[in-house]
Amino acid sequence: MLSRRGVMAGAAALAAGAAGLGLGGCTREVKAVAGFIGRMTAIQQRLGGRLGVYALTGNGDHTASGSLSIQSTERFAHCSTFKWLLATRVLQMADQGQVRLDKAIAYGKADLLDYAPVTKANAVRGHMTLSELCAAAVTLSDNTAANLLLAQVGGPAGLTQFARGLGDSETRFDRAEPDLNSNQANDPRDTTTPAAMAWLLKTVYTGTVLKPDSLAQLKAWMVGCQTGLKEIRAGVPAGWTVADKTGRGNGAVNDVAVVWPKDKTGKEQAPVFLAIYTTGGTLGDDDRNQIIADTTRLVFDSIGFVETLGQSASVSAE
């Protein structure tokens, strides 16, 4: 559960870190954090279930990062949020010469799942390229595309190994679509933590996992994601760049993103890596989407990310 003690300890740490760096406005930031707990508690009460959040900033230097966390080490079903990482692995394999993105992957009617808008539309062709499948999996969350890609990366076990190689000891992949969306209580299969997913985003976007052109392609796919227009994207000001991947299934509604804020002059700032996972409760889809949008707004409004985080400060409501 959310803890006032945890948030206030985070506020003190935030103020101390800002003071140590000679930053002004510490009192303002502490007051902002002090109000955070009530607003977040209200959001979780509206949800009627469990909410996990991890937000991280910084340009790859672990000593120059700020974070906000709410139940960020608890496990949640990742559902389709994993598809951005699946596309990352395919791009890495292409960078390493193991595959070509224009390689045609054959499939038939037996491979088509209920939710497969792009692969169904291309079924007459009988194949799609790896690049086309990645685009389908990320931008429209096509489940058949994801399964065809999983087969190319060594299945769930191969994708788990990839995550381990990126330093993630938490995220695991056990099944293919649609079974991975079962979201059963106390079932560790096909789960992640908000902290693990946010760090994966940061590792990929600020590291050397992908060559520059491949990273640009991943960003383009995620910026083009059409399934999350009412979630994280709805919680940030118009004009900010958002690259995200959503996921939902059996009471879980999730969104993970890289967000590039803009200052008052319109200049793009350092990215924020954000993972929001929810499960449980009885809200409908529209209300669940609003929970994620409101949580996103709270992340950026209450803490003052652009000015403060990224200065080795952290705020935790664990």
Task: Please identify what each model-predicted range represents.
Residues 2-12, 27-40, 47, 74, ...:
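Structured C-terminal helix/loop/strand segments within mature extracytoplasmic catalytic/sensor domains
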Residues 48-76:
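Short, conserved catalytic-motif segment at the N-terminal edge
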Residues 50-51, 147-206:
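Mid-domain, small-residue-enriched loop/turn segments at the edges of structured enzyme/sensor domains
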Residues 52-56, 85, 106, 148, ...:
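Soluble periplasmic/extracytoplasmic beta-strand elements of cell-envelope proteins
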Residues 77-105, 274:
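Active-site SXXK
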Residues 96-122:
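Short, glycine/proline-biased beta-turn/loop segments that scaffold the active-site neighborhood
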Residues 112-148, 156:
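Conserved catalytic neighborhood of penicillin-recognizing serine enzymes
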